[in-house]
Amino acid sequence: MADRVSELFTQNISEKNVSSAYAALKTLAQIIETSSQTTARGLFDELNEARSQILRKAFQISKISSRRLLSVRAGTDMFLYHINKVLSKADNFETCRGEVQLRAFDLAEGQQRSVDRIANEAKQLFKHGMTVLVHGYSRTVTSALELAAKSYHIKVIATECRPFCEGYETCKRLQKMRVPSEAILDGAVASYMGQVDAVVLGAEAIVESGGVINRVGTYTIALIAKQFQKPVYVLAECLKFVRMYPLSLSDMPDENFADFQALPGGEEFQNTRMPLCDLTPPDLITLLFTDLGILTPSAISDHLIQLYNG
Protein backbone atom coordinates (compact mmCIF):
# COMPACT_ATOMS: atom_id res chain seq x y z
CA MET A 1 0.00 0.00 0.00
CA ALA A 2 2.81 2.39 0.90
CA ASP A 3 4.25 2.37 -2.62
CA ARG A 4 0.84 2.97 -4.17
CA VAL A 5 0.05 5.91 -1.86
CA SER A 6 3.47 7.44 -2.54
CA GLU A 7 3.00 6.99 -6.29
CA LEU A 8 -0.48 8.55 -6.27
CA PHE A 9 0.65 11.52 -4.18
CA THR A 10 3.70 12.12 -6.37
CA GLN A 11 1.50 12.03 -9.45
CA ASN A 12 -1.09 14.39 -7.96
CA ILE A 13 1.44 16.89 -6.64
CA SER A 14 3.07 17.13 -10.08
CA GLU A 15 -0.17 18.41 -11.65
CA LYS A 16 -0.09 22.06 -12.66
CA ASN A 17 -1.62 24.54 -10.21
CA VAL A 18 -2.38 21.91 -7.57
CA SER A 19 -1.17 22.70 -4.06
CA SER A 20 0.43 20.11 -1.80
CA ALA A 21 -2.59 20.02 0.49
CA TYR A 22 -5.08 19.40 -2.29
CA ALA A 23 -2.79 16.80 -3.86
CA ALA A 24 -2.89 14.98 -0.52
CA LEU A 25 -6.69 15.22 -0.34
CA LYS A 26 -7.05 13.88 -3.87
CA THR A 27 -4.80 10.95 -2.94
CA LEU A 28 -6.98 10.11 0.06
CA ALA A 29 -10.11 10.38 -2.09
CA GLN A 30 -8.58 7.92 -4.56
CA ILE A 31 -7.81 5.52 -1.71
CA ILE A 32 -11.48 5.66 -0.67
CA GLU A 33 -12.60 5.06 -4.25
CA THR A 34 -10.54 1.88 -4.65
CA SER A 35 -10.67 0.57 -1.08
CA SER A 36 -11.79 -3.02 -0.51
CA GLN A 37 -12.61 -2.40 3.15
CA THR A 38 -16.02 -3.63 4.31
CA THR A 39 -16.32 -1.69 7.57
CA ALA A 40 -16.16 1.97 8.53
CA ARG A 41 -13.35 1.28 11.01
CA GLY A 42 -11.36 -0.61 8.40
CA LEU A 43 -11.67 2.25 5.91
CA PHE A 44 -10.74 4.89 8.47
CA ASP A 45 -7.69 2.91 9.58
CA GLU A 46 -6.64 2.55 5.94
CA LEU A 47 -6.99 6.31 5.45
CA ASN A 48 -4.95 7.02 8.58
CA GLU A 49 -2.16 4.78 7.31
CA ALA A 50 -2.34 6.47 3.89
CA ARG A 51 -2.10 9.87 5.58
CA SER A 52 1.06 8.78 7.38
CA GLN A 53 2.57 7.70 4.06
CA ILE A 54 1.59 11.01 2.45
CA LEU A 55 3.20 13.00 5.27
CA ARG A 56 6.41 11.01 4.95
CA LYS A 57 6.53 11.64 1.21
CA ALA A 58 5.62 15.32 1.65
CA PHE A 59 8.45 15.66 4.17
CA GLN A 60 10.94 14.29 1.64
CA ILE A 61 9.67 16.65 -1.06
CA SER A 62 9.72 19.69 1.23
CA LYS A 63 13.46 19.27 1.78
CA ILE A 64 14.30 19.76 -1.89
CA SER A 65 11.58 22.11 -3.09
CA SER A 66 9.26 24.88 -1.95
CA ARG A 67 6.38 22.41 -1.45
CA ARG A 68 4.77 22.85 1.95
CA LEU A 69 4.37 20.17 4.63
CA LEU A 70 2.35 21.90 7.34
CA SER A 71 -0.48 22.66 4.90
CA VAL A 72 -0.59 18.94 4.05
CA ARG A 73 -0.81 18.09 7.75
CA ALA A 74 -3.58 20.65 8.36
CA GLY A 75 -5.56 19.71 5.26
CA THR A 76 -5.48 15.96 5.80
CA ASP A 77 -6.39 16.40 9.47
CA MET A 78 -9.52 18.32 8.52
CA PHE A 79 -10.30 15.89 5.67
CA LEU A 80 -10.19 12.84 7.96
CA TYR A 81 -12.32 14.59 10.56
CA HIS A 82 -15.11 15.21 8.06
CA ILE A 83 -14.89 11.74 6.52
CA ASN A 84 -15.03 10.15 9.97
CA LYS A 85 -18.05 12.31 10.76
CA VAL A 86 -19.92 10.87 7.76
CA LEU A 87 -18.85 7.32 8.60
CA SER A 88 -19.84 7.57 12.26
CA LYS A 89 -23.37 8.75 11.44
CA ALA A 90 -24.12 5.90 9.04
CA ASP A 91 -26.15 2.90 10.17
CA ASN A 92 -24.81 0.76 7.36
CA PHE A 93 -21.35 1.07 5.82
CA GLU A 94 -22.36 -0.05 2.35
CA THR A 95 -25.14 2.53 2.09
CA CYS A 96 -22.83 5.40 3.07
CA ARG A 97 -19.87 4.39 0.87
CA GLY A 98 -21.19 6.47 -2.04
CA GLU A 99 -21.74 9.50 0.20
CA VAL A 100 -18.22 9.17 1.58
CA GLN A 101 -16.75 9.09 -1.94
CA LEU A 102 -18.74 12.15 -3.02
CA ARG A 103 -17.73 14.05 0.11
CA ALA A 104 -14.09 13.08 -0.34
CA PHE A 105 -13.84 14.25 -3.95
CA ASP A 106 -15.82 17.41 -3.17
CA LEU A 107 -13.21 18.33 -0.56
CA ALA A 108 -10.32 17.29 -2.79
CA GLU A 109 -11.50 19.29 -5.80
CA GLY A 110 -12.38 22.47 -3.93
CA GLN A 111 -9.12 24.35 -4.45
CA GLN A 112 -10.17 26.52 -7.37
CA ARG A 113 -13.52 27.37 -5.75
CA SER A 114 -11.76 28.50 -2.59
CA VAL A 115 -9.10 30.48 -4.45
CA ASP A 116 -11.71 32.25 -6.59
CA ARG A 117 -13.80 33.12 -3.53
CA ILE A 118 -10.80 34.58 -1.73
CA ALA A 119 -9.69 36.54 -4.81
CA ASN A 120 -13.14 38.12 -5.06
CA GLU A 121 -13.18 38.95 -1.34
CA ALA A 122 -9.70 40.48 -1.55
CA LYS A 123 -10.50 42.66 -4.55
CA GLN A 124 -11.71 45.40 -2.19
CA LEU A 125 -8.15 45.74 -0.85
CA PHE A 126 -6.86 47.26 -4.04
CA LYS A 127 -7.05 50.66 -5.70
CA HIS A 128 -5.44 52.44 -8.66
CA GLY A 129 -1.73 53.12 -8.27
CA MET A 130 -1.28 50.74 -5.36
CA THR A 131 2.07 49.05 -4.63
CA VAL A 132 1.92 45.69 -2.90
CA LEU A 133 4.72 43.71 -1.26
CA VAL A 134 4.51 39.90 -1.38
CA HIS A 135 6.74 37.17 0.03
CA GLY A 136 7.18 33.69 -1.43
CA TYR A 137 4.87 32.08 -3.95
CA SER A 138 1.18 31.60 -3.21
CA ARG A 139 -1.39 30.57 -5.81
CA THR A 140 -4.06 32.28 -3.74
CA VAL A 141 -2.16 35.57 -3.59
CA THR A 142 -1.17 35.59 -7.26
CA SER A 143 -4.76 34.78 -8.29
CA ALA A 144 -6.00 37.71 -6.21
CA LEU A 145 -3.40 40.03 -7.73
CA GLU A 146 -4.27 38.91 -11.26
CA LEU A 147 -7.97 39.57 -10.65
CA ALA A 148 -7.27 42.97 -9.09
CA ALA A 149 -5.03 43.94 -12.02
CA LYS A 150 -7.99 43.59 -14.38
CA SER A 151 -9.65 46.55 -12.64
CA TYR A 152 -6.77 48.53 -11.15
CA HIS A 153 -3.27 49.60 -12.10
CA ILE A 154 -1.15 47.96 -9.41
CA LYS A 155 2.53 47.20 -8.94
CA VAL A 156 3.94 44.19 -7.09
CA ILE A 157 7.26 43.99 -5.25
CA ALA A 158 8.26 40.39 -4.51
CA THR A 159 11.03 39.36 -2.15
CA GLU A 160 13.42 36.68 -3.42
CA CYS A 161 12.31 34.42 -0.56
CA ARG A 162 15.37 32.27 -0.10
CA PRO A 163 16.36 29.45 0.02
CA PHE A 164 14.04 28.44 -2.83
CA CYS A 165 13.81 31.94 -4.39
CA GLU A 166 10.06 31.66 -4.93
CA GLY A 167 9.80 35.39 -5.56
CA TYR A 168 11.06 34.89 -9.10
CA GLU A 169 8.27 32.40 -9.76
CA THR A 170 5.77 34.97 -8.49
CA CYS A 171 7.17 37.66 -10.80
CA LYS A 172 7.22 35.28 -13.75
CA ARG A 173 3.55 34.41 -13.34
CA LEU A 174 2.49 38.03 -12.79
CA GLN A 175 4.47 39.28 -15.78
CA LYS A 176 2.72 36.72 -17.97
CA MET A 177 -0.52 38.42 -16.90
CA ARG A 178 1.07 41.83 -17.62
CA VAL A 179 1.07 42.80 -13.94
CA PRO A 180 4.10 45.08 -13.27
CA SER A 181 6.37 43.33 -10.78
CA GLU A 182 9.96 43.26 -9.60
CA ALA A 183 12.01 41.05 -7.29
CA ILE A 184 14.09 42.45 -4.44
CA LEU A 185 16.56 40.96 -1.96
CA ASP A 186 15.05 39.66 1.27
CA GLY A 187 17.31 42.01 3.18
CA ALA A 188 16.04 45.04 1.25
CA VAL A 189 12.47 44.98 2.61
CA ALA A 190 13.00 47.95 4.94
CA SER A 191 14.46 49.98 2.06
CA TYR A 192 11.31 49.43 -0.03
CA MET A 193 8.61 49.46 2.65
CA GLY A 194 8.20 53.23 2.43
CA GLN A 195 6.84 52.97 -1.12
CA VAL A 196 4.53 50.05 -0.30
CA ASP A 197 0.82 50.53 0.40
CA ALA A 198 0.15 47.06 1.82
CA VAL A 199 1.76 43.69 2.46
CA VAL A 200 -0.21 40.74 1.06
CA LEU A 201 0.84 37.27 2.17
CA GLY A 202 -0.16 33.65 1.78
CA ALA A 203 0.11 31.07 4.54
CA GLU A 204 1.22 27.53 5.05
CA ALA A 205 -0.93 27.28 8.15
CA ILE A 206 -3.06 29.51 10.37
CA VAL A 207 -2.90 28.49 14.02
CA GLU A 208 -5.49 28.75 16.79
CA SER A 209 -4.19 32.07 18.08
CA GLY A 210 -4.71 33.68 14.66
CA GLY A 211 -0.97 33.66 14.06
CA VAL A 212 0.35 32.74 10.62
CA ILE A 213 2.97 30.16 9.71
CA ASN A 214 4.54 31.10 6.39
CA ARG A 215 7.87 31.18 4.58
CA VAL A 216 10.77 32.23 6.80
CA GLY A 217 11.12 36.01 6.72
CA THR A 218 7.38 36.67 7.02
CA TYR A 219 7.71 37.63 10.68
CA THR A 220 10.50 40.09 9.84
CA ILE A 221 8.43 41.64 7.06
CA ALA A 222 5.43 42.02 9.38
CA LEU A 223 7.61 43.74 12.01
CA ILE A 224 8.95 46.16 9.40
CA ALA A 225 5.42 46.81 8.12
CA LYS A 226 4.30 47.68 11.64
CA GLN A 227 7.20 50.13 11.99
CA PHE A 228 6.10 51.81 8.75
CA GLN A 229 2.39 51.60 9.72
CA LYS A 230 1.51 49.46 6.70
CA PRO A 231 -1.35 46.92 6.81
CA VAL A 232 -0.57 43.21 6.56
CA TYR A 233 -3.21 41.03 4.92
CA VAL A 234 -3.16 37.23 4.74
CA LEU A 235 -4.98 35.27 2.02
CA ALA A 236 -5.53 31.56 2.73
CA GLU A 237 -8.10 28.78 2.54
CA CYS A 238 -9.72 27.49 5.73
CA LEU A 239 -8.14 24.16 4.82
CA LYS A 240 -4.97 25.67 6.30
CA PHE A 241 -6.53 26.30 9.72
CA VAL A 242 -4.65 23.97 12.04
CA ARG A 243 -5.19 22.91 15.63
CA MET A 244 -1.81 24.09 16.89
CA TYR A 245 -0.89 26.78 19.40
CA PRO A 246 2.84 27.50 18.96
CA LEU A 247 4.06 30.49 20.92
CA SER A 248 7.40 30.89 19.16
CA LEU A 249 9.70 29.33 16.57
CA SER A 250 10.98 26.91 19.21
CA ASP A 251 7.50 25.35 19.37
CA MET A 252 7.52 24.52 15.66
CA PRO A 253 7.93 20.85 14.64
CA ASP A 254 11.44 19.61 13.73
CA GLU A 255 10.28 19.04 10.15
CA ASN A 256 10.28 22.83 9.77
CA PHE A 257 14.09 22.83 9.67
CA ALA A 258 16.30 21.87 6.75
CA ASP A 259 20.00 21.68 5.97
CA PHE A 260 21.43 23.62 3.05
CA GLN A 261 24.83 24.15 1.53
CA ALA A 262 26.07 27.72 1.48
CA LEU A 263 26.66 29.53 -1.79
CA PRO A 264 30.24 29.51 -3.18
CA GLY A 265 32.48 31.75 -1.14
CA GLY A 266 31.04 30.64 2.18
CA GLU A 267 33.10 27.49 2.60
CA GLU A 268 33.70 28.08 6.30
CA PHE A 269 29.91 27.93 6.79
CA GLN A 270 29.31 25.31 4.13
CA ASN A 271 26.70 23.36 6.09
CA THR A 272 23.86 25.60 7.19
CA ARG A 273 20.62 24.81 9.00
CA MET A 274 17.63 27.08 8.83
CA PRO A 275 13.87 27.11 9.41
CA LEU A 276 11.72 26.89 6.29
CA CYS A 277 8.90 28.83 7.95
CA ASP A 278 8.39 31.20 10.83
CA LEU A 279 5.47 32.23 13.02
CA THR A 280 3.98 35.71 12.74
CA PRO A 281 1.91 36.58 15.84
CA PRO A 282 -1.70 37.75 15.41
CA ASP A 283 -1.05 41.30 16.60
CA LEU A 284 0.96 41.92 13.41
CA ILE A 285 -1.85 40.72 11.11
CA THR A 286 -4.48 43.25 10.02
CA LEU A 287 -7.04 40.91 8.43
CA LEU A 288 -7.30 37.42 6.98
CA PHE A 289 -9.17 36.86 3.71
CA THR A 290 -10.44 33.29 3.61
CA ASP A 291 -13.07 31.22 1.83
CA LEU A 292 -15.14 31.62 5.01
CA GLY A 293 -15.06 35.39 4.66
CA ILE A 294 -12.93 38.23 6.01
CA LEU A 295 -11.73 37.44 9.52
CA THR A 296 -9.79 39.11 12.28
CA PRO A 297 -7.01 37.02 13.83
CA SER A 298 -9.02 36.74 17.06
CA ALA A 299 -11.85 35.01 15.16
CA ILE A 300 -9.75 32.04 14.03
CA SER A 301 -10.20 30.02 17.23
CA ASP A 302 -14.00 30.23 16.98
CA HIS A 303 -13.93 29.20 13.33
CA LEU A 304 -11.70 26.22 14.11
CA ILE A 305 -14.27 25.08 16.67
CA GLN A 306 -17.03 25.42 14.06
CA LEU A 307 -15.02 23.56 11.41
CA TYR A 308 -14.34 20.62 13.69
CA ASN A 309 -17.58 20.55 15.67
CA GLY A 310 -20.14 22.15 13.38
Task: Describe the residue ranges of each PLM region.
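Long amphipathic alpha-helical segments
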Residues: 1-100
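Conserved phosphate- and dinucleotide-binding cores of soluble alpha/beta proteins
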Residues: 3-4, 143, 148-154, 159-310
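Alpha-helical scaffold segments in soluble metabolic enzymes
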Residues: 7-8, 23-31, 53, 60, ...
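Short, glycine-rich nucleotide/cofactor-binding loops
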Residues: 15-18, 33-35, 131-133, 137, ...
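Gly/Ser/Thr-rich loops at beta-strand to alpha-helix junctions
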Residues: 68, 131-142, 163
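Generic alpha-helix initiation/capping and coil-helix boundary signal
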Residues: 69, 112-115, 218
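Ligand-binding beta-strand-loop-alpha-helix segment within the catalytic cores
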Residues: 80-133, 150-199
